[in-house]
């Protein structure tokens, strides 16, 4: 496995949260808050506000969750510095071709109101994964995404991506 445990920690209020170092060197908190199944934007905003106030510093969302805008709005209003919040989002399978993936990445950034996303994942291993991955690589090179990876992908699917592409999935 290419995730390395580190002795580092992520700023989380008074709590010392361990981090893992992804294979590209990016440090990710091991504890996070996800907003899956919270499509009501006001509820999502309140949930993320409460999570940040409680000390969570990893926030997980996705295009399919339909709440990226609420997550971004909450981050913008928060007293927590952006650099102290690790944001994960995911590209949905309907955008798994090169052109749609590029548009999907930009749409996530726009909805979140962020200059970059810390970790951007391919949500599921269906469709033109190779084309979507190429778009993620380009976005990473452009500074729009810090780390890229796959979500709900088994080891075989990640190995296939690994063998064909320039940048390896974060694991």
Predicted regions and their residues:
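Basic side chains
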Residues: 57, 82, 90, 111, ...
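Short active-site-adjacent helix-start/loop capping segments
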Residues: 68-69, 95-97
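Intrinsic low-complexity, intrinsically disordered segments enriched in polar/basic residues
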Residues: 2-8, 166, 170-171
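A cross-domain feature marking catalytic cores of carbohydrate-active enzymes
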Residues: 35, 61-63, 84, 89-91, ...
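Glycine/proline-rich, positively charged
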Residues: 39, 96-171
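N-terminal binding-site loop/beta-alpha segment at the start of enzyme catalytic domains
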Residues: 3-85, 141
């Amino acid at each position: 496995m290419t995730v390395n445990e580190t002795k580092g920690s992520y700023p989380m209020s008074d709590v010392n949260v361990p981090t893992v170092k992804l294979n590209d060197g990016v440090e990710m908190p091991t504890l996070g808050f996800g907003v899956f199944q919270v499509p009501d934007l006001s509820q999502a905003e309140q949930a993320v506000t409460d999570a940040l106030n409680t000390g969570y510093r990893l926030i997980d969302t996705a295009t399919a969750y339909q709440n990226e805008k609420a997550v971004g709005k909450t981050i913008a209003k928060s007293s927590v510095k952006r650099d102290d919040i690790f944001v994960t989002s995911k590209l949905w399978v309907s955008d798994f071709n090169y052109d749609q993936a590029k548009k999907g990445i930009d749409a996530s950034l726009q909805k979140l109101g962020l200059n970059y996303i810390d970790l951007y994942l391919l949500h599921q291993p269906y469709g033109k994964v190779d084309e979507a991955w190429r778009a993620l690589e380009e976005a990473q090179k452009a500074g729009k995404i810090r780390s890229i990876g796959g979500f709900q992908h088994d080891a075989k699917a990640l190995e296939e991506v690994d063998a064909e592409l320039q940048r390896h999935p974060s694991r």
